[in-house]
């Protein structure tokens, strides 16, 4: 009986291999077969909203900051292979991940991330998109598409089964209709969340020693932006006057707030942010090579003050609550405004405080 059983096992193994090969073939070439999944099926309540910068508002985009009504997901209908180049720093890659996920779902495609993006984000978040093996990446007949930084109608009807996206998208107009799913993807690992909450639990207001009632995360972007903004983009970073006004905005609206300051320029913050009221804590470590500790702190706060940059955007987006941001931080003729649309960058309910552009006028004088 042994030869018969052995033969049966071999036949069963061959059958499994054949079925697996057929399944893989159908997944890769599913786009060649009629599946009839248009936008009317994916999102039957699809609405277009006219916007001054041609922003395409996706179905289910919530009007209030803490709700979400995503399009129905049809996991079984996903076909093809989409990915995105991982480029830039931590916040850039978060934007690329969220945009890839949203656009792939909208177009009925399977999204994959490349190993470099997985290495950047997986140690921090519970991300779920599968990783594309390098050998598959190198052999796939990609069409490449560079995205601009706001959702456009043409992005909702991309017919390419093998698409590699690029660019630095970080606009709520791509993914806000999936807000709860995005927040789930960017859930901190337990040890990072617990460490951040432990830091916040130890904070006390300086004058009274009382526990704070409200935690306001403050992210001050400095570093390379000190040169890039004025020299390349004719813009500024947040100064001490802006931060003082933003903090006063929260002091007027929230009882006993404490401001948890993080930055890649902590020395400047200690010298230029007024901490005399006892409600400012310089908590960030400013380590750009390992930014997740600062990021975790910011997301565990109730509200956010941001200056510029994708790191601050994502901290505010995940924290929820009120957000104050630096508005109009470039001159009107800046080339930056060709690639950056404020309406698409900042949620409508966020509060903007205009930047002081006088240093730029001084630089422009002969």
Curated annotation (Swiss-Prot):
Q: Report the locations given in the UniProt record.
A: Golgi apparatus, Golgi stack membrane
Tagged with keyword Lyase:
no
Q: Highest taxon of the source?
A: Eukaryota
This molecule's function is given as: Catalyzes the transfer of L-fucose, from a guanosine diphosphate-beta-L-fucose, to the terminal galactose residue of glycoconjugates through an alpha(1,2) linkage leading to H antigen synthesis that is an intermediate substrate in the synthesis of ABO blood group antigens. H antigen is essential for maturation of the glomerular layer of the main olfactory bulb, in cell migration and early cell-cell contacts during tumor associated angiogenesis. Preferentially fucosylates soluble lactose and to a lesser extent fucosylates glycolipids gangliosides GA1 and GM1a.
Q: Which InterPro entries match?
A: Glyco_trans_11
Record-annotated membrane-spanning stretches:
9-25
Topology with respect to the bilayer: Single-pass type II membrane protein
Q: Does the keyword Metal-binding apply?
A: no
UniProt catalytic activity: a beta-D-galactosyl-(1->4)-N-acetyl-beta-D-glucosaminyl derivative + GDP-beta-L-fucose = an alpha-L-Fuc-(1->2)-beta-D-Gal-(1->4)-beta-D-GlcNAc derivative + GDP + H(+); a ganglioside GA1 + GDP-beta-L-fucose = a ganglioside Fuc-GA1 + GDP + H(+); a beta-D-Gal-(1->3)-beta-D-GlcNAc-(1->3)-beta-D-Gal-(1->4)-beta-D-Glc-(1<->1')-Cer(d18:1(4E)) + GDP-beta-L-fucose = alpha-L-fucosyl-(1->2)- beta-D-galactosyl-(1->3)-N-acetyl-beta-D-glucosaminyl-(1->3)-beta-D-galactosyl-(1->4)-beta-D-glucosyl-(1<->1')-N-acylsphing-4-enine + GDP + H(+); a neolactoside nLc4Cer(d18:1(4E)) + GDP-beta-L-fucose = a neolactoside IV(2)-alpha-Fuc-nLc4Cer(d18:1(4E)) + GDP + H(+)
Quote the pathway field: Protein modification; protein glycosylation
Instruction: Enumerate the Lumenal topological stretches.
Output: 26-366
> Per the similarity annotation, which family is this?
Belongs to the glycosyltransferase 11 family.
Protein name according to UniProt:
Galactoside alpha-(1,2)-fucosyltransferase 1
Q: What class of enzyme is it?
A: transferase
């Amino acid at each position: 009986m042994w030869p018969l059983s052995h033969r049966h096992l071999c036949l069963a193994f061959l059958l499994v291999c054949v079925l697996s090969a057929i399944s893989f073939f159908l997944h890769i070439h599913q786009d060649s077969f009629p599946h009839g999944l248009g936008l009317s099926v994916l999102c039957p309540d699809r609405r277009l909203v006219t916007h001054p910068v041609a922003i395409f508002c996706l179905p289910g985009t919530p009007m209030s900051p803490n709700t979400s009504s995503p399009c129905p997901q049809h996991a079984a209908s996903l076909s093809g292979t989409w990915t995105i180049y991982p480029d830039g720093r931590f916040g850039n890659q978060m934007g690329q991940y969220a945009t890839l996920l949203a656009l792939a779902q909208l177009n009925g495609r399977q999204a994959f991330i490349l190993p470099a993006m997985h290495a950047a984000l997986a140690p921090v978040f519970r991300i779920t998109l599968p990783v594309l093996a390098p050998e598959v990446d190198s052999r796939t007949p990609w069409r490449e598409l560079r995205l601009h930084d706001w959702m456009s109608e043409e992005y909702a009807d991309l017919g390419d089964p093998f698409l590699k996206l690029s660019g630095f998208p970080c606009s709520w107009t791509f993914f806000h209709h999936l807000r709860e799913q995005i927040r789930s993807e960017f859930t901190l690992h337990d040890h990072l969340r617990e460490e951040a909450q432990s830091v916040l639990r130890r904070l006390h207001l300086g004058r009274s020693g009382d526990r704070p009632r409200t935690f306001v995360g403050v992210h001050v972007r400095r570093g390379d932006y000190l040169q890039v903004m004025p020299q390349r983009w004719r813009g500024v970073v947040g100064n001490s006057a802006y931060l003082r006004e933003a903090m006063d905005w929260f002091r007027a609206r929230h009882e006993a707030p404490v401001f948890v300051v993080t930055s890649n320029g902590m020395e400047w913050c200690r010298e230029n942010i007024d901490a005399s009221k006892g409600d400012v804590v310089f908590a960030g470590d400013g380590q750009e090579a390992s930014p997740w500790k600062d990021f975790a702190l910011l997301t565990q706060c109730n509200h956010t003050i941001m200056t510029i940059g994708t790191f601050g955007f994502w901290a505010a987006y995940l924290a929820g609550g009120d957000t104050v941001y630096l508005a109009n931080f470039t001159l009107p003729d800046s080339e930056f405004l060709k690639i950056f649309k404020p309406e698409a960058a900042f949620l409508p309910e966020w509060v903007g405080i205009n930047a002081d552009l006088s240093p730029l006028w001084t630089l422009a004088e002969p």
